[in-house]
Amino acid sequence: MKKILLLNGPNLNMLGKREPHIYGSQTLADIENHLQQLAKARGYCLEYFQANGEEPIINRIHQSFQNTDFIIINPGASTHTSVALRDALLSVAIPFVEVHLSNVHAREPFRHHSYLSDVAKGVICGLGAKGYDYALDYAIQFLKSGK
């Protein structure tokens, strides 16, 4: 069974509580459980991991080397600051999609730059929790196509 890893970065554990007018009312657990059910129904294994620090996320990316087929990542604020996260993703050579709940381009200027976007298969932003569904759909189609 092909494996997809869902990674969520800093502060995403606060979904449903933190600024719901920006990030929505669903909790991270709601999103993870929903995606896991969708993946399972389509014959895929979905694992998930969230951390508020850079090191645990990088370690989890390294652990995925040669045993994960696709990564869906919402790096949170690390999007705009972490060269190390970019290097970790490049080092394992696993295709990935970058997801953001809010439209980062409609927010503060410091949120407009991503260290990941140019090496991602795609970027989904501004569509709320539904963006994760679209990322999962893309991951499955990508894996089915054998690219």
From Swiss-Prot:
Top-level enzyme category: lyase
UniProt-listed PROSITE patterns: DEHYDROQUINASE_II
InterPro entries named among the record's database cross-references: DHquinase_II (IPR001874), DHquinase_II_CS (IPR018509), DHquinase_II_sf (IPR036441)
An annotated Gene Ontology molecular function: 3-dehydroquinate dehydratase activity
Active site per UniProt: Y23 (proton acceptor), H100 (proton donor)
Alphabetical UniProt keywords: Amino-acid biosynthesis, Aromatic amino acid biosynthesis, Lyase
Residues that bind substrate: N74, H80, D87, L101, S102, R111
Reaction catalyzed: 3-dehydroquinate = 3-dehydroshikimate + H2O
Record has Lyase as a keyword: yes
Record GO biological process: amino acid biosynthetic process; aromatic amino acid family biosynthetic process; chorismate biosynthetic process; quinate catabolic process
Pfam families: DHquinase_II
Pathway given in the UniProt record: Metabolic intermediate biosynthesis; chorismate biosynthesis; chorismate from D-erythrose 4-phosphate and phosphoenolpyruvate: step 3/7
Superkingdom assignment: Bacteria
EC id: 4.2.1.10
Site feature Transition state stabilizer, where: R18
Role this protein plays: Catalyzes a trans-dehydration via an enolate intermediate.
Family as reported in the entry's similarity comment: Belongs to the type-II 3-dehydroquinase family.
Subunit structure of this chain's protein: Homododecamer.
The protein, known as: 3-dehydroquinate dehydratase
Encoding gene (name): aroQ
